[in-house]
Amino acid sequence: MKLLVVFSLSILLFVVPTSAQEKHEAMKPVNITEISVEVEGGKTVKMKAADLAKLTRKEIKAKDHDGVEALFSGYELRDIIAPAGAKLGKDLKGPMIAQYLVVEAADGYHAVFSVTELDPDFTDKVVILGDKRDGKPLENWQIIATNEKKHARWVRQVTALKVRLAH
């Protein structure tokens, strides 16, 4: 019996580092060249940096994961999802209030925002797809959300923005 326990523990010692290593591998920088913007009932648009550059840049001050204040710049999510058909402004009423945005990352991480959280008619909160911090380029696009106590929705390596309607 003791031999079985020792054998089982020794296997765990070899398995755990592999799992941690796999997790670390998934966090390595990737070169993301476009973001897919998809709106249920609308269309799917592929946006590259040149497409985003046509939008109005927004700068916001926010504290990063370590609590250090920085100046982030990028593009408001509402400006990115609107061309694909997301309902905002005067059209964000009735059943459209149930729209939500799923942010997807290269490593499989997901976060969700209500579309009302992105609309200035509903909130003063600002959520951007950031590409710079203190004037220096970020490795990949990242979600930056003001006034968040936790940074669980600060998705890194963003690959897709998908607007859905809760039914």
What is the meaning of each model-derived region?
Residues V5-V15:
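Bacterial N-terminal signal peptides
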Residues V16-A20:
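Sec/Tat signal peptide C-region and signal peptidase I cleavage site
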Residues Q21-H167:
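N-terminal intrinsically disordered, low-complexity segments enriched in P/E/S/T
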